[in-house]
């Protein structure tokens, strides 16, 4: 596998990626894309392929240089640069022992509190330590602005509207509050929406940020998390506003949203104005079926099912990737990747096989 990836290199081309996302041209090769790679995966790749060997470990910029080097080696045109860290909002979290075997184990894995978040009352809302854009540490983004190669781009995730409302209230509490205290829910949507609008504007002020990527899980296997009416009235208008900011600043608006979103897909495409949809699961809607339904209206990203990658051997993975590409590369608007993220529980070899088969496709 090491030999194949090294002998079949691909070079980033962010301009072609942008044309793919806008469905302006049929790609000349397969472009990989991911919401993000877990830290453990990136570290494993860097050690396996000797990407750290000539770096100065005492250099404070080592981590940023490695972000570029790892993603460039893997063939990505854009990659996530986390600016808003997971602890920027004060949330109730449930750490549990990570069950990943071997060197990719991270010790603990944090799960969202489903029942009661830090905000339950108007008093909690008033006393909550609301973060501001002014409090962000932008040094990593400023460094990328000066040092990121011109054929690459970066992004951070934005527009976690429903997700953050859910985290702050707790999903169970949200379901009650929609009926018992809608004004509190609306106040949360307003506060969170304004924060992410400001953050989207900030991201657009950096030339190195090539795309605006909203990330907001809105569904589960059989339905949306809350009613489509609630989503249309309280959540999607904020995504529309973020998409408008992105488009006004010459960026495509991508959305990562897990779950069965069939009831709001037309809204996402026609009213929000998304350029690309990410996150697909075989048990909900395989990406090949999604491509047949939606590819004339929106670009589709990823879709190699994470559960499948975790459980399958090389021949099956190669076959699945090739079958997916035969459908999704027939026209415009597709990039190869996992159905969700490159999580640390995906076997590294399986992930690399997926990438390698993508490199082989047009050869």
Q: What name fits each language-model region?
A:
Residues 57-58, 75-80, 120:
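N-terminal substrate-binding region of glycoside hydrolase catalytic domains
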Residues 63-83, 202-207:
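Catalytic domains of carbohydrate-active enzymes, especially glycoside hydrolases
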Residues 81-93, 160-162:
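Short, glycine/charge-rich beta-strand/loop segments that flank catalytic centers
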Residues 69-74, 91, 143-147:
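Short, charge-rich binding segments
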Residues 1-42, 46-55, 101-112, 116-363:
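Active-site loop segments of alpha/beta catalytic cores
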Residues 97:
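Active-site diphosphate/adenylate-binding microenvironment
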Residues 44-73:
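Active-site-flanking structural segment that lines cofactor/substrate pockets
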